[in-house]
């Protein structure tokens, strides 16, 4: 008996990309004041499309408050995705505040301090 042919390995990435694009538009229409200026960084979808982790950062506003508000609006957003996506299972959304940009800014500040300290040491020598 022949093995079951799996769907294209890129399909998961395509679905995740489409979810990200559609969610960007749907989130823009939310009226919750706790949601700041949100940027979606990426979406990870499970192989069975049952769950999707949506990673986001916040330019303006509180990240934790935005995460709470987005997770509360997840059902509404999932319903909006259901109307836009043409797949059998629309994943349950789980929003995760991505602190990568904050950590990168902190690292840049540390590097700048180290370089400034080193140049002072070189000038003193």
From Swiss-Prot:
Q: Which GO terms describe its molecular function?
A: ribosomal small subunit binding
Name the principal localization, coarsely classed.
cytoplasm
**GO cellular component annotations of the record:** cytosol
List where in the cell it is found: Cytoplasm
The record's section on HAMAP family has:
RbfA (MF_00003)
Give the UniProt family note. Belongs to the RbfA family.
The protein in question is named Ribosome-binding factor A
